[in-house]
Regions:
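N-terminal active-site beta-alpha-beta segment that forms phosphate/nucleotide-binding
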Residues: 1-109
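Conserved phosphate- and dinucleotide-binding cores of soluble alpha/beta proteins
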Residues: 77-178
């Protein structure tokens, strides 16, 4: 966390652009796609530039790709995903994260491509999150999805105590920093 917190805004944006290029290539391999993302907290990988392209119709107009974009919201003790039509339809949660308003349409994740924030990954691609267990619980129930861990190079191969609920990523998008 300390290393991530010390990154400059320029380093975060450069790393984010690198990962967005990889997600862009993933999107272009599909005719339709459900993409579930997250809003960045602190120096997490920032996908807002990608979300703006999606919401502006870039992929539909230029590649005839239908995209449903969803973001998570914590509701009580669980996380749910909601369709996003505008980044203006978000509000700050008690955790300080921008989330969809409750008037948004819920998405039940199935065959979605899910971009997952994390603190680190172990050698088996299991995710160390922030301790709330929201992603682990959600994707423990909704297993028919592709999970993509978005990491800086220094977040790889971290040693941490793994429990039975820690989910493994299917794929990693990694950005080298420095």
């Amino acid at each position: 966390m300390e290393k991530r917190n010390s990154l400059s805004r320029e380093e975060v944006l450069s790393a984010s652009e690198s990962i967005i290029r990889e997600i862009d290539a993933l999107i272009k391999k599909n005719k339709s796609i459900v993409l579930l993302g997250f809003m960045p907290l602190g120096n997490e990988i920032d996908l807002r530039a990608l979300y703006k392209k999606i919401l502006a119709g870039y992929y539909k107009e230029n590649f005839d790709i239908d995209i449903i974009l969803g973001l998570p919201r914590v509701c009580g003790k669980e996380m749910r995903f909601f369709k996003i039509d505008s980044l203006d339809n978000l509000e700050k949660s008690k955790f300080g994260i921008m989330e969809p308003r409750l008037n948004s349409e819920e998405i039940i994740a199935k065959n979605a491509h899910v971009m997952v924030p994390l603190i680190g990954l172990d050698k088996d691609k299991r995710r160390l999150g922030f301790g709330g267990g929201f992603y682990d619980k959600y994707f423990g129930k909704h297993k028919d999805n592709k999970l993509y861990g978005l990491v800086y190079d220094f977040q790889m191969n971290i040693d941490f105590e793994v429990n039975e609920y820690d989910i493994a990523m299917d794929h990693i998008f990694m950005a080298k920093v420095g």
